[in-house]
Amino acid sequence: MNPLIVRGIRERLRVKHLIAAGLFSLILCSTIYLSAYLEGAEGDWVLDRETQNWKRGEPSPVEGARQAFTYLLALQGFFLMFLGTGRVAAITAEEKESGLMDYQRMTPMNPFSKITGYLFGLPAREYFMFAVTLPFLLHCMIVGELSIDNVLHLYFVFFSSVVLYHLTAHVIGLVVPKPRAASWVSRIVVLGLYVFLPAFGQAGISLLSFLTILPPYFGKMLPELISRQSNDY
């Protein structure tokens, strides 16, 4: 295995880190996912035309799982795209400041192996937190009857975006001298892509949206998530 990945795992996935990160991810994910799932599974409010009163429709676990999917995807993005990007930038800046980066350049490794080691070794804890959410994703796919092709397409773009953001964070860490500043600069860049780009898209500037997961989500997943609800009406 890549020695930089091994070093990242040993430094950032010690027992105390595993317990803390695992509990944080599990509690947060289970709370968000189950809240959205149970709310959606109870059924939608339907107007009774005879009594003019609102009543809940039939319980639908499928609808609950589909409603929870978006919340789960957002949480996974928070772990890898926000926390992971900041981690890569901060540790890169820290190692550059301490001189460890110069030492790594002298090791007998090709550039591709070094970059791969940094991309997957530095955010090892965030990848572990993402892995904790995978059972919830599996439940969502099975109960929600989601298309495997659409899910694989979405997560292929998801991980491509994660690699792009982490590469950008690595460059920011090499340029910005302070670890904390590098971390927040990289996180603000990611936030800008998902907060400000939709506004630019309404103005006709949609080119940068292809740096995000928004096109496959709105183009493939969202129509499937709302298709059952549309058919009910």
Q: What is the predicted function of each stretch?
A:
Residues 76-83, 131, 159, 163, ...:
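Residue-level signal for the membrane-embedded core of alpha-helical transmembrane segments
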Residues 63-75, 115, 119, 123, ...:
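Hydrophobic, aromatic-rich alpha-helical transmembrane segments
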Residues 1-68, 150, 156, 160-233:
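Transmembrane alpha-helical segments and their membrane-interface loop/helix boundaries
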Residues 89-93, 137-141, 169-173, 177:
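Membrane-water interface at transmembrane helix exits
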Residues 68-94, 98-100, 111:
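Long, hydrophobic alpha-helical segments
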Residues 77, 111, 115-145:
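Hydrophobic alpha-helical transmembrane segments that constitute the membrane-spanning cores
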Residues 91, 126, 158-162:
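Residue-level hotspots within the lipid-embedded alpha helices of multi-pass solute transporters
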